[in-house]
Amino acid sequence: MGSFSTITASFLLFLACQLLWQTGANPVYGSVSNADLMDFKNLLDHLEDKMPLEDEVVPPQVLSEQNEEAGAALSPLPEVPPWAGEVNPAQRDGGALGRGSWDSSDRSALLKSKLRALLAAPRSLRRSSCFGGRMDRIGAQSGLGCNSFRYRR
C-alpha cells in the first residue's frame, strides 16, 4: 500500500505544479483562485501526513525481536532425526514406495489402457491450427495460418 500512496502523492503534486504553471496557457483553466490552491495544498499536506515514511530506519533490536517471535512460532515443528545413509533392501527394490508388487506386464497393460483412453478422448484430437477451424481454412488459403505449408513448384 506504500507504493500506491507514493504514486498518489506524486500525482497530486504533479497536478499542483501543472495548475501553477498553466496560468497563461489556457484561459479557461487559468483562473484558479487562491482559495482553491490553498485547499489543494492542505489536502496534499494531509495526505503526506497520513503516508508513512518508507525510509524509516528500524532499530536492530526490533528486528531481532521479530526474528525471535518468528522462530518461536516455528519451534512446535517435530524434530527430524538425521539420515544415517543406509537403505533397506525393501527400499532398494521399490517396495517401500508401493511399486515393488507390480509386475511389468500389469504396469504395461495399465499404461497402454491409459494411452488408448487419452488418444480416444475428444479433446486430444489433433488440431491443425491455433485459432480454430474457420481461421485455419482462411490461413491455408492465404498462407498466413499457424500450420499452413505452401509447396513450392
Curated annotation (Swiss-Prot):
Any Pfam family matching the protein: ANP
InterPro entries for the chain: Natr_peptide, Natr_peptide_CS, Natriuretic_peptide, Natriuretic_peptide_atrial
GO terms of molecular function: hormone activity
Positions bearing Phosphoserine: S129
Keyword Ion transport: no
UniProt keyword Repeat, yes or no: no
Keyword entries, A-Z: Cell projection, Disulfide bond, Hormone, Phosphoprotein, Secreted, Signal, Vasoactive, Vasodilator
GO biological process: cGMP biosynthetic process; female pregnancy; receptor guanylyl cyclase signaling pathway; regulation of blood pressure; vasodilation
Residues annotated as signal peptide: 1-25
Important for degradation of atrial natriuretic peptide by IDE as annotated region, ranges: 147-151
UniProt-annotated stretches for the region Disordered: 62-104
Marked site (Cleavage) residue numbers: R123, S124, C130, F131
Propeptide span(s): 26-123, 93-103
One GO CC term on file: cell projection
SS bond partners: C130-C146
Record PTM: The precursor molecule is proteolytically cleaved by CORIN at Arg-123 to produce the atrial natriuretic peptide. Undergoes further proteolytic cleavage by unknown proteases to give rise to long-acting natriuretic peptide, vessel dilator and kaliuretic peptide. Additional processing gives rise to the auriculin and atriopeptin peptides. In the kidneys, alternative processing by an unknown protease results in the peptide urodilatin.
Domain of life: Eukaryota
Assigned protein family: Belongs to the natriuretic peptide family.
Protein name per UniProt: Natriuretic peptides A
Source organism of this protein record: Felis catus (Cat)
